[in-house]
Regions:
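PDZ domains - specifically the beta-sandwich core and the conserved carboxylate-binding loop
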Residues: 213-215
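C-terminal helical cap(s) of enzyme catalytic domains, especially alpha/beta-barrels
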Residues: 236-237, 247-257
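Alpha/beta enzyme core
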Residues: 3-211, 220-239, 243
Length: 257
């Protein structure tokens, strides 16, 4: 939803058909397939017993103008449970004006999901225009994303999804929050694995699993980029990665690879 159907599927229109998304996940050996109520609901009767379904509860609908950093619920936990999903996912835009409301909504949804025996996955993303300073984008800073992960596990997410960190020192550069210099000198270095390990530490030292984003497709480097993300994540103590546009914005056989 956040990337819009046209922009997402124009490179490979077969994925306008939800069944092909599920087939890609199955043939690619994925542990689960995460998508919308509409996509998974349209094929649930045929596929919910063949691969675990993760239904995304909320989205940025991206058709309001001007667009805002917000997430709206598209359905309920009970709907996801009724279609045979084993887990629900949700996004909170930490740092945005609406993040407090999103926290309350998703905490309540996750509580009910656990009552039904479902797992919960939280997309712990940052969204604030002031998180960019000059040429540096601190939306992927280890200290900021680590704290977002910490908030996510506090509302009992079983898995957190986060961007792979590319820098550090967001709190200091932006000039807010609380810091201890040892966050930057002892708990992390500039090495990508150490930056990711700081994210893992904020997930109760790995008690809550960390998966990193696959990111947008860059063409011929996609496989290499995915391997790097997976290796960094696993060596840092994470649980892997989630692939989307890197997989379905190319022919099925290449996506499976």
């Amino acid at each position: 939803i956040e990337h819009t159907a046209g922009a997402s599927f124009a490179p490979n229109p077969i994925y306008f058909d939800p069944e092909n998304i599920v087939k890609l996940a199955i043939e690619g050996g994925c542990n689960a397939v995460a998508s919308t109520f509409g996509i998974l609901g349209s094929v649930a009767r045929k596929y919910a017993h063949k691969i675990p379904f993760v239904v995304k509860l909320n989205h940025n609908e991206l058709l309001s103008y001007p667009n805002s950093f917000d997430q709206v619920l598209f359905g309920t936990v009970k709907e996801a449970w009724n279609m045979g999903a084993v887990a629900v996912g949700a996004t909170i835009y930490f740092g945005s004006e609406q993040s407090r409301r999103q926290l309350v909504e998703i905490a309540e949804a996750f509580e009910y999901a656990h009552e039904l025996g479902m797992a919960t996955i939280l997309w712990c993303y940052l969204r604030n225009n002031d998180f960019k300073k000059g040429a540096i984008d601190y939306h992927s800073a280890a200290d900021l994303t680590g704290q977002a992960d910490r908030l996510g596990v506090t509302i009992k997410a079983d898995i957190v999804k986060q961007k792979l960190p590319t820098n550090n020192g967001g709190f200091k550069a932006i000039g807010f929050g609380k810091v201890d210099e040892r966050m930057y000198t002892e708990l992390a270095t500039d090495h990508p694995i150490d930056l990711c390990r700081y994210q893992v530490a904020n997930g109760y030292m790995g008690r809550v699993g960390l998966i990193n984003s696959g990111g947008e497709s860059h063409g011929t480097s996609d496989l290499r980029d995915a391997v790097i993300t997976a290796v960094v994540n696993k060596r840092a103590g994470g649980m892997g990665l989630i692939s989307g546009r890197k997989a379905f914005q190319k022919p099925m056989n290449k996506g499976v690879e």
